[in-house]
C-alpha cells in the first residue's frame, strides 16, 4: 500500500533548514528550532526529515525506512549497541469539516492518554499543519459570561465537544485555505523556562529523548568497540510501530530506549515518592529501585556513579510494541533512560534541563565519547530560547509592515500584561499608542485610571458632556502565599473557568519587573482514570509550581506575595480578519478609544466648539468596576450627560453556544450592548445609535448579552449609560476571538458619537 507522505509546511521547512545550516556550520543540532516542529503520532515526517538533515550536516550518513524511522550506524563488528528514542507525541488529526467552517478532530493515539487530555485542549491555541502551510487555530470553548445562564452547557470533558476554529465560516473557506481532512493538529504553546532551569511545554516528555540522542549523535565516533546505531523511531504512541520495524530490520546485542518511561499499572504518575525534576537521570528496570550489577541497567548505574551523575533506578514498563503478529524480542541486555517529569502528557509537562544534561553525559560516557561541559548558561537543550528566533516569529510579526493602524495598536495592547490592580504596563502601552499631543494632556488619577479630556470645559456650554470608557485590566491570578515546599498559593483575579488555565504554563509577574515561568497545577487525582473535575469555584485556591523546593528558593527568584500571574500571550491572526489572543477583552475597547482620539485630532475644540469629551481607560473592571466607580464618584457633582462604555459583547457565534442569547455575528459590525447584567440602555438611545450608524454606512448589530459594563456605575449620578462593543467568542479564555472589521466599525462609530451625539 502506498504510504501517505505529508508535505513539509513552509514554517516547519524554514525551521528544518535553519537547523541543518547550524549543524553544517559545526554548531551542532539546533534543538531549540527542531523542538517547534509538530510531530503528531503518525505525522512525524517533517520532524524526521529535519533530524535526517541535521545528522547529515554532522557528516553522518542517516538511513530511513517506510515508516520514516531515521538511524545512523558507526563502527563494525560486535557488540551491536542500539540506542533508540521516539519522535512522536499525542495530538489530533482533522476528521471532519463542518458546513460552518469548523474542524472536528480525532485523537492520535485514538485512546485518551489520560483523563484530562481532551479537557486541556478546550479554548487553547493550536496549529493545523496543512500540505502548504501552518494555520493558526484555536479550540472553541464555552463563553465564561454565558455559562451561568445555560441549562446544559457543554462539560468540555469529551472529544465529541471539541471544535477547531481557524477563522473560516464555511467548508469552502476551509479548503480554500489549504486545510483538509487528515491534517494533523497540535497545541501551539512554545516551551517556557520554569523557575531557573526547568522547562515546560506540550510534549516535553516525548521530546527529551530525541533531543538528548540528537545531541549525542552530533559527536558520534568510532571510539567504542563494535557497532553503534542511534535511531529515531516514529509512531511509538500508536503501538511502537516504528520500533517494531526497526528491531525487525536491525537486531542488536544490547539496547537503550531513551525517553518517556512508562509507569507500571497501578502506580500513579503523581506518586509522592517518585523522583522529581532535579533528582537526576532515571534508569528504568522491570522492578524495584536497585539494578543488578551484571545487567545493562546495573552497568549504567555504575557508570553514572563513576561520572558523578545523579541517578535513580525506577520500575518501568518496556516500550510498547503492539499490533498484529508477534513483536520482536528486546535484546537480553536492555535498559531504559529518562528523566523525571511532572504533569506528564499535559500541555505543561515539566522536566529539569540539568537532568537532561546529565542524561546526555551518561550516554556519551556509555559510548566513550568526550563529554563536553554543559551548564544552564550554555545549554543545547534550552528549547525556550527559540521563542525569540526569527523563524519563530508569530504571523502577526511578519505582516506588521502592511497591517492597519488599528491592528498594530491592538497587537501592542493585547501583548501588554496587566491583571486587575496591576495595570501599569497597559497604561504605558496605551500612552505609547496615543499621539504626542494627546499624551501630554493625559493624566493618571488616584485609582490608576488614564484620563484624557478634550473640548470645552466651560459651564453653560451648548454641547454635551460625553465620557468614553474602556478598561485596561485583564483576568489573572495573584500570589497569596508561598508554601514551605516552594509552590505558590494563588487566588483568581476575575471570573473564568479554571480548567482553561490549570495544567498549562503561566508567568509570575514580579514586583521587580521580571517574569518567572511556572505551571498551574491540576487538581489532585488528575492522573487517575476515574478523575472528575471538581465543581467550578472562584474561591478555591490554586497552586503553581515554579521549579523550587522551598520558600527560600522561590523568594530567591524574586517572587513575593502580591505578585500577579497571567498566561504567556501571543497575537495569533486566523483566516480573514479574525484574531485570537487573551485580553481582547478589553484591549479592543482600549484600541477603539485610541483610534478615536487619533481621528479627532488636537484641534477638536476648535472644530466642534461647545462639546466636552473625556476618554477614560479604567482599572479594576474585572473585579467590580473599581476604577470606573472611583472616576464616576469624582465627577458626580458635574456628572457627564452620557457614558459610552466600550466593552465586549460576548457572542453566541460559536458551536459551543445556543443562539437564544447574545446573538451577534463576528464580522457583521459593532454591537449596541442594549441589555446585560448591569444595565439596560434607554431604548430611544439604542434606536438613535442604530440610526446614526445606518446613516453613515457603519455596520451595526444590537442585542442582549451577559456580564457587566463600567457605565453602570455612572447611572446613580444621573448619567445615561449607552453600552457598546464588538462581538467576541470564547470569553475569558486563552483564545478570545474577534474580527478586526468589527473594531474598525466600532472606532468609526465612537468618532461619530464624539462629534454628532
What do the PLM-derived regions correspond to, one by one?
Residues 4-9, 14-757:
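N-terminal hydrophobic/helix-forming segments and targeting peptides
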Amino acid at each position: 500500500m502506498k504510504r501517505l507522505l505529508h508535505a513539509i509546511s513552509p514554517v516547519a521547512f524554514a525551521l528544518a533548514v535553519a537547523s541543518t545550516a547550524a549543524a553544517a556550520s559545526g554548531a551542532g543540532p539546533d534543538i531549540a528550532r527542531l523542538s517547534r516542529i509538530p510531530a503528531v503520532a503518525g505525522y512525524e515526517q517533517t520532524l524526521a526529515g529535519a533530524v535526517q538533515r541535521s545528522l547529515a550536516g554532522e557528516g553522518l550518513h542517516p538511513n530511513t525506512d517506510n515508516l520514516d524511522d531515521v538511524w545512523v550506524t558507526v563502527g563494525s563488528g560486535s557488540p551491536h549497541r542500539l540506542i533508540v528514542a521516539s519522535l512522536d507525541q499525542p495530538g489530533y488529526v482533522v476528521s471532519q469539516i463542518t458546513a460552518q467552517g469548523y474542524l472536528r478532530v480525532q485523537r492520535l493515539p485514538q485512546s485518551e492518554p489520560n483523563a484530562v487530555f481532551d479537557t486541556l485542549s478546550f479554548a487553547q491555541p493550536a496549529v493545523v499543519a496543512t500540505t502548504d502551510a501552518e494555520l493558526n487555530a484555536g479550540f472553541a470553548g464555552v463563553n465564561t459570561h454565558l455559562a451561568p445562564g445555560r441549562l446544559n452547557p457543554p462539560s468540555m470533558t469529551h472529544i465529541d465537544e471539541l471544535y477547531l476554529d481557524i477563522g473560516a465560516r464555511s467548508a469552502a473557506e476551509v479548503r480554500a485555505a489549504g486545510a483538509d481532512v487528515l491534517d494533523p493538529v497540535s497545541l501551539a504553546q512554545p516551551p517556557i523556562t520554569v523557575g531557573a532551569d526547568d522547562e515546560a511545554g506540550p510534549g516535553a516528555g516525548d521530546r527529551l529523548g530525541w533531543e538528548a540522542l540528537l545531541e549525542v549523535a552530533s559527536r558520534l565516533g568510532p571510539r567504542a568497540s563494535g557497532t553503534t546505531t542511534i535511531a529515531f523511531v516514529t509512531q511509538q504512541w500508536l503501538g511502537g510501530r516504528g520500533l517494531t520495524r526497526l528491531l525487525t530490520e536491525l537486531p542488536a546485542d544490547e539496547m537503550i530506549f531513551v525517553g518517556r518511561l512508562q509507569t507500571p499499572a497501578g502506580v500513579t504518575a503523581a506518586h509522592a515518592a517518585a523522583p522529581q525534576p532535579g533528582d537526576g537521570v532515571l534508569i528504568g528496570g522491570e522492578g524495584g529501585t536497585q539494578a543488578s550489577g551484571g545487567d545493562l541497567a546495573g552497568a549504567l548505574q555504575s557508570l553514572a556513579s563513576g561520572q558523578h551523575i545523579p541517578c535513580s533506578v525506577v520500575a518501568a514498563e518496556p516500550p510498547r510494541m503492539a499490533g498484529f503478529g508477534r513483536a520482536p524480542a528486546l535484546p537480553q541486555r536492555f535498559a531504559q533512560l529518562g528523566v523525571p517529569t511532572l504533569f506528564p502528557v499535559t500541555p505543561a509537562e515539566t522536566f529539569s534541563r540539568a537532568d537532561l544534561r546529565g542524561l546526555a553525559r551518561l550516554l556519551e560516557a556509555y559510548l566513550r565519547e568526550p563529554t563536553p561541559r554543559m551548564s544552564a548558561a550554555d545549554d543545547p537543550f534550552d528549547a525556550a530560547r527559540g521563542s525569540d528566533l526569527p523563524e519563530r516569529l508569530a504571523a502577526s510579526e511578519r505582516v506588521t509592515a502592511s497591517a492597519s493602524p488599528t491592528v498594530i495598536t491592538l497587537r501592542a495592547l493585547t501583548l501588554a500584561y496587566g491583571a486587575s490592580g496591576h495595570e501599569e504596563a497597559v497604561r504605558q502601552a496605551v500612552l505609547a499608542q496615543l499621539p504626542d499631543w494627546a499624551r501630554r494632556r493625559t493624566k493618571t488619577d488616584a485609582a490608576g485610571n488614564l484620563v484624557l479630556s478634550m473640548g470645552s470645559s466651560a459651564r453653560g456650554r451648548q454641547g454635551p458632556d460625553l465620557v468614553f470608557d474602556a478598561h485596561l485590566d485583564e483576568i489573572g491570578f495573584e500570589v497569596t502565599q508561598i508554601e514551605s515546599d516552594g509552590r505558590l498559593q494563588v487566588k483568581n483575579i476575575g471570573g473564568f473557568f479554571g480548567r482553561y488555565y490549570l495544567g498549562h504554563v503561566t508567568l509570575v509577574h514580579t514586583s521587580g519587573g521580571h517574569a518567572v515561568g511556572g505551571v498551574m497545577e491540576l487538581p489532585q487525582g488528575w492522573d487517575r482514570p476515574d478523575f472528575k473535575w471538581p465543581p467550578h469555584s472562584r474561591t478555591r485556591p490554586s497552586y503553581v509550581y515554579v521549579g523550587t523546593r522551598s520558600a527560600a528558593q522561590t523568594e530567591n527568584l524574586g517572587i513575593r506575595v502580591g505578585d500577579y500571574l497571567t498566561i504567556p500571550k501571543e497575537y495569533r491572526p486566523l483566516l480573514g480578519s479574525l484574531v485570537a489572543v487573551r485580553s481582547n477583552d478589553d484591549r479592543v475597547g482600549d484600541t477603539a478609544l485610541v483610534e478615536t482620539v487619533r481621528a479627532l485630532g488636537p484641534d477638536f475644540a476648535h472644530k466642534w466648539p461647545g462639546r466636552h469629551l473625556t476618554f477614560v481607560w479604567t482599572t479594576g473592571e474585572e473585579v467590580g468596576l473599581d476604577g470606573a466607580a472611583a472616576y464616576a464618584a469624582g465627577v458626580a457633582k458635574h456628572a457627564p450627560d452620557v457614558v459610552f462604555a466600550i466593552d465586549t459583547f460576548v457572542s453566541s457565534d460559536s458551536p459551543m453556544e445556543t443562539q437564544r442569547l447574545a446573538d451577534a455575528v463576528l464580522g457583521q459590525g459593532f454591537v449596541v450592548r442594549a441589555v446585560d447584567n448591569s444595565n439596560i440602555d434607554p431604548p430611544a438611545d439604542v434606536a438613535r445609535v442604530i440610526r446614526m450608524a445606518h446613516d453613515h454606512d457603519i455596520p451595526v448589530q444590537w442585542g442582549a448579552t451577559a456580564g457587566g459594563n463600567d457605565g453602570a456605575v455612572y447611572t446613580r449620578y444621573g448619567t445615561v449609560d449607552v453600552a457598546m462593543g464588538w462581538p467576541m467568542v470564547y470569553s475569558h479564555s486563552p483564545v478570545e476571538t474577534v474580527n478586526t472589521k468589527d473594531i474598525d466599525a466600532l472606532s468609526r462609530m465612537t468618532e461619530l458619537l464624539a462629534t454628532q451625539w
